[in-house]
């Protein structure tokens, strides 16, 4: 009994660390300022909610439910703390940290880790190894944003066109669908053309990775075009 309780406390601790790291990534992406105290309390709140569900509604405490609940949590956090930024962009801010981290982790787990003798089945059955890959993926997501010089915090000022708004809605919808397929549905219960759930996940990850990077590139180009137009207008006014 004591061993199970200590193991449970270990999982709670790992959950809090994971949520706090994800909140820090969210704050970095959206430029919505979160102090350490707020990050800690928000992380603790979501984990305590999970503990309550696990205690009183154990039948509903599944991996799929927990993952979708965390996604909803980040969207609600973005909508609450990001006002008065337009809702579609706040939803983007809420979805992006979870989806980018998931894409990086899934790519590593499916295509890189097996090269070092760590197949998906081994990682998925080892909780601490899975958490380790997740935390590592959060750090890689941070460096991904830094490497490609994405300034998502400026998008609310520079995504002004109707086309950009539509692209943002498509991006949000695709991120939610990806997360639902990878984390909200038990793919092992599906049988698509005789493929295993692992093969199906690999196809989804590769397909969405290409789609996601394409959508980000288009949106980023829209932002830069708007900035160039603004700079051109300012220079013309200075000349005149």
PLM regions with names:
Residues 9-16, 203-207:
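Hydrophobic alpha-helical transmembrane segments of multi-pass membrane proteins
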Residues 239-240:
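Histidine-centered phosphotransfer motif of kinases
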Residues 141-158, 179-194, 203-236:
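Juxtamembrane or sensor-core-proximal signal-transducing alpha helices
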Residues 40-49, 171-178:
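Alpha-helical transmembrane segments
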Residues 1-7:
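Short, strongly hydrophobic alpha-helical membrane anchors
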Residues 19-23, 44-47:
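Primarily extracytoplasmic/secreted proteins
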Residues 12, 20-39, 52-172, 185-191:
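Juxtamembrane segments at transmembrane-helix boundaries
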């Amino acid at each position: 009994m004591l061993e199970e309780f200590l193991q449970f406390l270990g999982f709670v601790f790992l959950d809090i660390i994971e949520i706090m790291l994800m909140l820090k990534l969210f704050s970095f992406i959206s430029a919505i300022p979160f102090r350490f105290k707020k990050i800690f309390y928000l992380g603790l709140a979501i984990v305590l909610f999970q503990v309550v569900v696990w205690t009183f509604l154990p039948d509903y405490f599944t991996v799929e439910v927990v993952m979708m609940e965390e996604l909803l949590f980040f969207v609600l956090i973005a909508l609450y703390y990001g006002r008065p930024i337009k809702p579609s962009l706040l939803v983007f801010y809420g979805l992006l940290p979870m989806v980018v981290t998931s894409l990086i982790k899934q790519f590593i787990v499916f295509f890189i880790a097996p090269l070092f003798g760590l197949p998906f089945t081994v990682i998925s059955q080892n909780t601490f190894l899975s958490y380790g890959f997740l935390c590592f993926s959060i750090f890689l997501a941070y460096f991904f944003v830094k490497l490609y010089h994405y300034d998502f915090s400026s998008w609310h000022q520079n995504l002004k066109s109707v086309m950009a708004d539509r692209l943002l809605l498509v991006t949000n919808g695709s991120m939610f669908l990806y997360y639902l397929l990878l984390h909200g549905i038990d793919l092992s219960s599906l049988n698509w053309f005789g493929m295993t759930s692992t093969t199906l996940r690999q196809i989804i990850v590769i397909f969405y990775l290409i789609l996601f990077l394409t959508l980000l590139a288009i949106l980023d180009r829209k932002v830069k075009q708007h900035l160039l137009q603004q700079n051109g207008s300012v220079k013309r006014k200075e000349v005149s």
